[in-house]
C-alpha cells in the first residue's frame, strides 16, 4: 500500500532523485515526437539539478523542451512554478538542458517538461509532456 501523497500526478517522496518520461502519458505523440524525459536530483545543500530532453525519431525542422521547476505549496495543496527555461534547436532529432537551481529548503520540488517536435510544413508541432515525482529538500 502506498501512503505517499499524490499531487497532480506526482508523488511526494523522500528520494534523492526522480525521473519521468512521456511513456507514462496516453497522449498521441504524432509522427515526429518519439520520447520526452524530465529529471530532478539533489545537488547539494539547497540545490537541485533539473533536466529535460526531447527526442524525435528523425531530424525535424524544430525541436524543443521547456523545463519547469515546481515547488509544492502545503497551504494550497498545489504545485507552484518557481523556475522555467526553454531550449530549442533546428534540423536535428535531440535537444536537452540541465541546470542547477537554488531552492528554499524544507519543501518538495518536481520538474515537468513540455516537449515539441515538428516540421515547418506541419499545421501544428507534435507536443507531449513528462513530469517527475516530488523530492524533499531538507
Regions found by a protein language model. Name each.
Residues 30-69:
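Short, surface-exposed binding/anchoring microloops in extracellular/periplasmic proteins
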Residues 108, 112-122:
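Enriched for extracellular/lumenal, surface-exposed ectodomains of secreted and cell-surface proteins
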Residues 93-103:
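Exposed aromatic-hydrophobic patches
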Residues 45-47, 62, 104-112:
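Extracellular Ig-like/FN3 beta-sandwich strand-entry sites
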Residues 67-68, 78-92:
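Solvent-exposed serine/threonine-rich low-complexity stretches and specific carbohydrate-binding patches
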Residues 54-58, 69-73, 102, 117-119:
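Beta-strand elements of well-folded, non-transmembrane domains
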Residues 120-138:
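Short beta-strand elements
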Residues 1-41:
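N-terminal prepro-regions of secreted/extracellular proteins
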